[in-house]
């Protein structure tokens, strides 16, 4: 399932990262190349454990010192990161968000979620649920909420 949800600045599109089919559908809807990769977000630090397990304790503590918040970490991708998430990169972007919609969705799914702006590539991102619906119709499940956080 593909979700549309408000974030700190724009509306986002996301899904479970282990669903290659949904990730490809997001890229198709956005007219975005798969090789660009996607960020993984969650409201719960423990959801990142599988993606940080290969890092030193010092680096893990450094991520904890900046999270939750707007800081995005680019870390070397380990074997837990599917190729359709990292794209052509050897790294994966991770962020622990404080936005209520991301916290709620990641808790409901008990997982990180992929995140990318809700827009057609190279076009301005959606700023509200109506714009998301106009862009993607019934292809996405739109969560309630407001931008900011």
Regions found by a protein language model. Give the residues of each.
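Active-site-adjacent structural elements in enzyme catalytic cores
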Residues: 1-149
């Amino acid at each position: 399932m593909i979700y549309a949800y408000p974030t700190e600045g724009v509306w986002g599109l996301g899904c479970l990262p282990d669903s290659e089919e949904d990730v490809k559908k997001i890229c198709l809807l956005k007219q975005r190349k798969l090789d660009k990769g996607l960020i993984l977000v969650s409201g719960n630090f423990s959801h990142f454990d599988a993606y940080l397990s290969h890092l030193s304790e010092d680096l893990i503590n450094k991520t904890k010192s900046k999270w939750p918040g707007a800081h995005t970490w680019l870390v070397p991708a380990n074997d837990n990161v599917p190729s359709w998430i990292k794209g052509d990169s050897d790294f994966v972007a991770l962020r622990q968000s404080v936005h209520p919609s991301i916290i709620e969705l990641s808790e409901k799914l008990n997982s990180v979620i992929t995140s990318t702006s809700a827009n057609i590539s190279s076009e301005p991102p959606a700023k509200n649920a109506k714009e998301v619906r106009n862009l993607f119709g019934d292809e996405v499940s739109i969560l309630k909420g407001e931008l900011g956080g």
